[in-house]
Amino acid sequence: MRTFRSLVVAGAALLVLVVAAPARSHHAFSAEFDANKPIKFKGTVTKMLWVNPHAWIYVDVKKPDGTVEEWMIETGTPNTLLRRGLTKESLPTGTEITVDGYQSKDGSRRANGRDLTLPNGQTLFLGSSGTGAPDEKK
């Protein structure tokens, strides 16, 4: 009976570790973004998704040749953004912004947003990078 109980406890502990691993890796900056690929660009907001666990800002960026690329910017949680003064209504479609962040490891046009500068010059920390991002000072 004691051996059976030990097996059940060990099995439950293993199950918790297996289930928790993907959630932990999802929230690690280094799992999705490349600290060696900082990016900075200006663009036009096309939409904002105010969803958990991360809000997303979609930005059209005009390249030097005139073509337009759509970038997806991962931010912190909506609650984090609210605490920093950013609301869903803060970035209406057409708003020109500057984004500082880090490109995704897979090379897609997806980035971890670190700072966002509004047309009036105000810079907001997007709260997504968290511990593990380069030069974590905020």
Q: Where do the protein language model's features map onto the residues?
A:
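Bacterial N-terminal signal peptides that target proteins for export
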Residues: 1-11
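Bacterial N-terminal signal peptides
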Residues: 9-20
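Short N-terminal segments immediately surrounding and downstream of signal-peptide cleavage
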Residues: 26-42
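Conserved hydrophobic positions within beta-strands
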Residues: 43-45, 96
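Short nucleic-acid-contacting surface segments enriched for D/E, G, S/T with interspersed K/R
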Residues: 83-99
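OB-fold/S1-family single-stranded nucleic acid-binding modules
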Residues: 104-128
